[in-house]
Each structure stands twice: as C-alpha cells, then as structure tokens.
Design a protein with these regions (language model features):
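Class I S-adenosylmethionine-dependent transferase superfamily signal
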Residues: 120, 193-194, 220
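Conserved SAM/SAH cofactor-binding pocket of Class I
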Residues: 86-175
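Conserved class I S-adenosyl-L-methionine
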Residues: 208-223
Length: 244
C-alpha cells in the first residue's frame, strides 16, 4: 500500500505551546479511531433504547464462587467481550459484604446483558432481584441469559434509570453506571436510588477515578449524608452509602 504525502505530513513532530514534544497529533488519533471524542460517540449507543450497530452475538463464560454463568453478548451492549473488571469487582465486593442469607430485594441499574444481577441471583437464590436497562438489545440478552442459566429469582424490566420501579423500594441498589451517557444520567441514577431505597438500604456503585469518581462520590454524599470507599483495585472504586 502506498502512503500519500499527507499521511507523512501528519507524522511530523509537533510541539505544544509550552514546547513539549508531541509525537502523535489529533489527526492521527482520529485516523485510527483512538480519539476520546470518537470513542465516546462509539460507546454512546450502550445507553440507547435501540442500538444502531449490526448484531454480532458471541458467548462468554463467567465464574463466581461455585457458580458458572454462560452468557450471550452482542454488539451494541457494554463490555461484549468479557465481564468487565468493574462489574466483577462490584459482584465480589457485594457478595463479601452480604453472603447468601435471608431474602432481600435488590435492583441492578443499567444491567446490560446481566452479569451483575444474574451472578448475585445465582449465588444467592433467596434474593429477589430486579434488573433494569433502557437498551432493548441488552434486555433481550439478559432474558436469554436468565433462562439459559436457570436464574429464576430475577425480573428484567425496561427502565430509564429507575423510573419504571417508582412504586417499589429495595434493600440494596447496585450500579455500574453508564458513564458515557453523561453526568446528568449518572447523577439521576443516584437521585432515584436514594428515593427507591428502604430506610437503612444500601447503594453500591463501581466507578473509575478517571471517569468521575470524585464528583460521583460528592454527589452521593450530598444525597445520603455518607459515602465510603469499601474497595478499590486498578483504578476502580466501590462506593457504598446507607440511607438513614
């Protein structure tokens, strides 16, 4: 393949205003799809009702304690290639805080194809879990994965944040929030979670520091009057708040 002169022009060294050498400029990042703005646009469909990307299903496995989940994922849903590190950390942290025991009500907000709610439901079959998402493709996958893994204690519902369950209250609400949907959506999840928790109910959030953990922590503390970092690993933080 013959490179055009314009390509080599883009590879010439660049210097910022303060004289710091810049090897790769924005045009190169754009050419290879690595610009953060482009990545944000690419990921925005995860919180759309109807993803406009072509379906391409695949199967993955996820092991938690003595439970093995076989999951179908697809293009247009979050973390289609594997259960992401943040969700895995949230699942393990929650199960450490709350080993299998008496029946509790749990909401999994932004459930995607279902790893969080299904893993907890499989390990703790006495709990009643409501899984919520706005993405119809993700919801269909979650239903398929529920059936395939015989997790009978979960209900899957279409919902923008927690709007569909405004008549219910929960003991625990868990979320790996859709960061790319924007701060307004993420903060709305926190606000509605506060309203939908029982007194002494608990909110669990996984979020990366570089993707807004400090502002999320501040917002949650404003709502709940308390927030605690109960786990952190590889830049991911688990925030916990208790409704007083």
């Amino acid at each position: 393949m013959q490179m055009q002169p314009e390509f080599f022009e883009k590879l010439k060294p660049r210097y910022s205003n303060n004289g710091v050498f810049q090897l790769i400029n924005t045009s190169i990042l754009n050419a290879f799809g690595l610009n953060d703005k482009n990545r944000g646009e690419e990921m925005s469909h995860y919180y759309d009702e109807q993803p406009d990307v072509k379906s391409n299903p695949k199967r993955i496995s996820y092991q938690i304690k003595n439970a093995q989940l076989e999951l179908t994922t697809d293009a247009g849903v979050f973390s289609k290639d594997n259960v992401d590190f943040g969700s895995d950390l949230l699942i393990k942290t929650f199960l450490k805080e709350h080993p299998p025991g008496p029946s509790k009500t749990i909401a999994d907000v932004g459930c995607g194809y279902g790893p969080i709610g299904l893993a907890i439901g499989k390990v703790s079959p006495h709990h009643k879990i409501t899984m919520l998402d706005i993405n119809n493709r993700a919801l269909a996958l979650a239903e398929m994965n529920k059936t395939k893994n015989q997790v009978d204690n979960v209900t899957i519902m279409e919902s923008n944040c927690l709007s569909t369950v405004n008549h219910q209250c929960f003991d625990y609400i868990l979320t790996n929030p859709p960061i790319r949907a924007g701060k307004d959506i993420v903060h709305r999840i926190f606000e509605q979670a506060f309203d939908r928790l029982k007194t002494t109910g608990e909110l669990y959030v996984v979020i990366q520091k570089k993707q807004g953990m400090p502002s999320a922590k501040k917002k949650i503390e404003e709502l709940f009057g308390n927030v605690e970092i109960i786990a952190k690993s590889k830049g991911y933080y688990i925030l916990k708040s208790i409704k007083g």
